[in-house]
């Protein structure tokens, strides 16, 4: 079933489910966070180390979903990239060779701040999470197994975009969040491109 995505004077249609990129839903994402809490609720090993794993995994998942960033870019983010005063993350985008400024909510900023306070890096030039892309894949797949949801990192990015579209967030805002250089890229991924949509795009109404 297609969902209408109103914006301006148009009614943009989300693609059919099987035509959309593989993605997770917000409920899936919440399920992953719950799985992190369950996994480390009763640690069998050193409690301090278990708490670090819990906090690291939770922060990875939150940054993946709430920024919509690519996993490699998220893993490269350093503590100095988080601007707590302006409540944004200045995320370096390797694919575009630019910086995407992403607004963050206060709750996520608090979690980042707590992580830095509890686990201060030996070198602030090192990434915040300081794990490899392979390790991040394993962490994410681990919670996919726990919840019974097949998942890979890029499904967070697509999932956020689709969630925002379904929440009637304007297309340019979503495109900026994803760091797309052109909103047509966003349209092609997720929406049915009809002749009317093309006309409105050319006319600058989208």
Give names to the regions the model predicted:
Residues 1-206:
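Conserved catalytic core of the tyrosine transesterase superfamily
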């Amino acid at each position: 079933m297609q969902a209408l995505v109103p914006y301006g004077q148009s009614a943009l249609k989300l693609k059919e489910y099987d035509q959309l990129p593989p993605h997770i839903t917000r409920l899936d994402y919440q399920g992953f966070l719950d799985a992190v809490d369950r996994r480390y609720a009763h640690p069998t090993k050193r409690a301090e180390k278990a708490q670090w794993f819990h906090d690291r995994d939770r922060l990875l998942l939150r940054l993946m979903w709430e920024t919509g960033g690519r996993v490699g870019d998220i893993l490269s983010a350093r503590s100095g990239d988080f601007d707590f005063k302006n409540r944004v993350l200045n995320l370096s985008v390797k694919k575009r060779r630019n910086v995407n400024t992403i607004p963050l909510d206060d709750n996520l900023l608090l979690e980042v701040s707590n992580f830095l306070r509890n686990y201060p890096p030996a070198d602030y030039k090192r990434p915040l999470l300081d794990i490899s892309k392979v390790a991040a894949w394993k962490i994410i797949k681990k919670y996919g197994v726990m919840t019974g949801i097949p998942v890979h990192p890029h499904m967070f990015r697509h999932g956020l975009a689709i969630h925002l579209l379904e929440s009637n967030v304007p297309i340019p805002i979503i495109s900026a969040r994803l760091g797309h250089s052109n909103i047509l890229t966003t349209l092609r991924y997720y929406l049915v491109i009809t002749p009317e949509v093309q006309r409105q795009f050319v006319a600058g109404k989208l």
